[in-house]
Amino acid sequence: MTLNLRVMTPNRTVWNSEVQEMILSTNSGQIGVLPNHAPLLTALDIGITKIRLNGQWSTMALMGGFAMVDNNQVTILVNEAEEAAGIDPQEAKETFRIAQTNLARAEGKKQVIEANLAFKRAKARLEAIDATLSYASN
């Protein structure tokens, strides 16, 4: 038995296929979704989503949004999403380094909030790459 997963941003459909299971990063922690999961509507935090398809795990960086699970259909609406395989590791590391520096130097409430958001996005992209590399080494 499988789940039908659709991941959509305002501009495109990032993923649209059947999967065996997935792990979502919600605002209150991670949640696993298997076939026949109870209906659910949840906010998604900036973080990674792990997807198992044909026994292999894939990872995607999601930049906040919502997920709805109902009748083996999972619909994810996010501001932005990137599959780990499409993220340039060098660029992601550099973006993370810059985000760390900007967060440390941020002054004033607005600057701190913006720097923290950029840091969380950069961290999610790096975590997606790291998770994919750990799956490949197992």
UniProtKB/Swiss-Prot annotation:
Bilayer topology: Peripheral membrane protein
Which CDD domains does this UniProt record tie to the protein? F1-ATPase_delta (cd12152)
Instruction: Give the location in the cell.
Output: Plastid, Chloroplast thylakoid membrane
The UniProt keywords, alphabetically, are:
ATP synthesis, CF(1), Chloroplast, Hydrogen ion transport, Ion transport, Membrane, Plastid, Thylakoid, Transport
Q: Name one GO molecular function term.
A: ATP binding
The protein's matches in Pfam families, at most eight in alphabetical order, are given as: ATP-synt_DE (PF00401), ATP-synt_DE_N (PF02823)
The answer on whether this UniProt entry bears the keyword Plastid reads yes
Taking the first listed entry, what is the main subcellular location of this protein, grouped into a coarse class?
plastid
Report which superkingdom the organism of origin falls in. Answer: Eukaryota
- Please give the GO cellular component terms listed in this UniProt entry: chloroplast thylakoid membrane; proton-transporting ATP synthase complex
Q: What family, per the record?
A: Belongs to the ATPase epsilon chain family.
Q: What does this protein do?
A: Produces ATP from ADP in the presence of a proton gradient across the membrane.
Assembly behavior: F-type ATPases have 2 components, CF(1) - the catalytic core - and CF(0) - the membrane proton channel. CF(1) has five subunits: alpha(3), beta(3), gamma(1), delta(1), epsilon(1). CF(0) has three main subunits: a, b and c.
Task: State the protein's name.
Answer: ATP synthase epsilon chain, chloroplastic
